Every structure is written in C-alpha cells, then in structure tokens.
C-alpha cells in the first residue's frame, strides 16, 4: 500500500519547517550547500606572508624629503649590465622607428 505523493510532500514540508531547512520538492539546484560553507577569503589572505618593505618603497616614500638611500642590489645589477654592454653581450637596443614596408620585404 503506497502513500500518495501529495501526502509525502506535506510531510516533507512539515519536516522542513520543523528543522529549519529549505523545502525543495522538485530537487532544483539552489546552491545552499555552497552558501552554507564558511568563507574562504580570510584563510586565503593569511596564506601568503605579508610583504616586507624594501629599499625602493623607502625611496618612493621618502624621496620628497631629499634623503638618499643606496640600493646595493640595484647598483650591483646596473654595474653588471654596464659590464655586459661594454663587451657587447647586453640586450640589443630597441628600435625607435616603426617597421616600414622595405623592412618587411627583407629576407631573414
């Protein structure tokens, strides 16, 4: 002996009211499972360490006061690039003009 569908729906509706759940007789996807979960934003924000203040940030911040700050790492980098350029091992110079039609016809 089976119970009519309407009677089962009344039972489910009463159960949902009693236990404070959503009544969804058609089984439509509502996203309640995702919405009930805890927010992940704070956990993701604390995953990466906070950024430390570097020499460049200090130069930007206090450059208007006339304070000079030496960035040894950047100075070493610039010296290294100058040495490479002196031996013709550095990056090529950028072109200053737009490519013309004659440049496109050249064989490579």
Curated annotation (Swiss-Prot):
It is found in: Mitochondrion. Pfam families: MRP-S33 (PF08293). Signal peptide: none annotated. Keywords: Mitochondrion, Ribonucleoprotein, Ribosomal protein. It comes from the Eukaryota. InterPro entries: Ribosomal_mS33. Component of the mitochondrial small ribosomal subunit (mt-SSU). Mature N.crassa 74S mitochondrial ribosomes consist of a small (37S) and a large (54S) subunit. The 37S small subunit contains a 16S ribosomal RNA (16S mt-rRNA) and 32 different proteins. The 54S large subunit contains a 23S rRNA (23S mt-rRNA) and 42 different proteins. Component of the mitochondrial ribosome (mitoribosome), a dedicated translation machinery responsible for the synthesis of mitochondrial genome-encoded proteins, including at least some of the essential transmembrane subunits of the mitochondrial respiratory chain. The mitoribosomes are attached to the mitochondrial inner membrane and translation products are cotranslationally integrated into the membrane. This is Small ribosomal subunit protein mS33. It comes from Neurospora crassa (strain ATCC 24698 / 74-OR23-1A / CBS 708.71 / DSM 1257 / FGSC 987).
């Amino acid at each position: 002996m089976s119970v009519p569908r309407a009677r089962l729906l009344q039972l489910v509706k009463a159960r949902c009211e009693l236990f404070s759940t959503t009544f969804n007789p058609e089984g439509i996807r509502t996203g309640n499972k995702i919405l009930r979960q805890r927010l992940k934003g704070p956990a993701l924000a604390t995953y990466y360490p906070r950024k430390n203040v570097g020499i460049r940030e200090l130069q930007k911040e206090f450059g208007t006061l006339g304070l000079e700050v030496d960035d040894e790492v950047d100075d070493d980098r610039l010296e290294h690039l100058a040495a490479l350029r002196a031996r013709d091992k550095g990056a090529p110079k950028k072109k200053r003009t737009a490519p013309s039609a004659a440049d496109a016809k050249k064989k490579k």
